[in-house]
Amino acid sequence: MADRVRKPEWLKINIGANDRYTETKRIVDSHCLHTICSSGRCPNMGECWGKGTATFMIGGDICTRSCKFCNTQTGRPHPLDANEPTHVAESIALMKLDHAVVTSVDRDDLPDLGAGHWAHTIREIKRLNPQTTIEVLIPDFQGRICLLYTSDAA
């Protein structure tokens, strides 16, 4: 059996749990939130969290789809957490973010595919963080344009 080739040092990613990383993790965990960073096993998580930022993932941590490019768990999701929109907004305030990024799992199990939850989350972020810009990485809502207007109205 051939010897295993080791990765060069420049290719290795240092998670480097500095104070900002630890504080970001504490805020996310204490608000029972999910991030695509951890769910998707992002190799840049240490860098982003180390700078005090994270991409929030709403709608739970179980996706109804099984995309080949994503590491998020798939299956039958839990019911939506009605407190999640407020928890996301509070976390953004605690992290003092000027710009927040929010994505979600696909929720094909819900009649509105999660559009109402998106709208509620955006409204809560704006209410508690009026100066923060929000980047939303929304699902495709199965091409149902009317649902896009629901989330866009927020």
Short names for language-model regions:
Residues 46-56, 71-83:
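Iron-sulfur (Fe-S) cluster-binding segments and ferredoxin-like electron-carrier domains
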Residues 98:
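Short acidic/polar active-site loop segments enriched in Thr and Asp
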Residues 104:
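Short secondary-structure boundary segments
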Residues 149-154:
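Conserved small/polar residues in nucleotide/adenosyl-binding loops
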Residues 74-92, 107-148:
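Canonical radical SAM enzyme core domain
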Residues 1-66:
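Flexible, acidic/Gly-rich N-terminal and inter-domain linker regions that tether
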